[in-house]
Amino acid sequence: MSDETAKPFEPKPCPICGKPSIERYKPFCSKRCADVDLNRWLTGAYAIPVVEEEDEDGEPLSPPLRPE
């Protein structure tokens, strides 16, 4: 690929505030936005929805037991 056809690097927007991201905190624009995202993960704000399965009786399956 020649230099004439190469596109200059354009940073993607920060997923928290929308400002351009910077290399140091990629994909975020700042330490603050990176910390906001980490806090959302740690407090459960980001979650994957789960469909509860039922057994043959129509009763919900019991949650798996945690090893102690």
From Swiss-Prot:
<feature type="binding site">
    <location>
        <position position="14"/>
    </location>
    <ligand>
        <name>Zn(2+)</name>
    </ligand>
</feature>
<dbReference type="GO" id="GO:0008270">
    <property type="term" value="F:zinc ion binding"/>
</dbReference>
<dbReference type="Pfam" id="PF03884">
    <property type="entry name" value="YacG"/>
</dbReference>
<feature type="binding site">
    <location>
        <position position="17"/>
    </location>
    <ligand>
        <name>Zn(2+)</name>
    </ligand>
</feature>
<comment type="subunit">
    <text>Interacts with GyrB.</text>
</comment>
<dbReference type="GO" id="GO:0006355">
    <property type="term" value="P:regulation of DNA-templated transcription"/>
</dbReference>
<keyword id="KW-0862">Zinc</keyword>
<dbReference type="InterPro" id="IPR005584">
    <property type="entry name" value="DNA_gyrase_inhibitor_YacG"/>
</dbReference>
<dbReference type="InterPro" id="IPR013088">
    <property type="entry name" value="Znf_NHR/GATA"/>
</dbReference>
<protein>
    <recommendedName>
        <fullName>DNA gyrase inhibitor YacG</fullName>
    </recommendedName>
</protein>
<keyword id="KW-0479">Metal-binding</keyword>
<dbReference type="GO" id="GO:0008657">
    <property type="term" value="F:DNA topoisomerase type II (double strand cut, ATP-hydrolyzing) inhibitor activity"/>
</dbReference>
<comment type="similarity">
    <text>Belongs to the DNA gyrase inhibitor YacG family.</text>
</comment>
<feature type="binding site">
    <location>
        <position position="29"/>
    </location>
    <ligand>
        <name>Zn(2+)</name>
    </ligand>
</feature>
<feature type="binding site">
    <location>
        <position position="33"/>
    </location>
    <ligand>
        <name>Zn(2+)</name>
    </ligand>
</feature>
<comment type="function">
    <text>Inhibits all the catalytic activities of DNA gyrase by preventing its interaction with DNA. Acts by binding directly to the C-terminal domain of GyrB, which probably disrupts DNA binding by the gyrase.</text>
</comment>
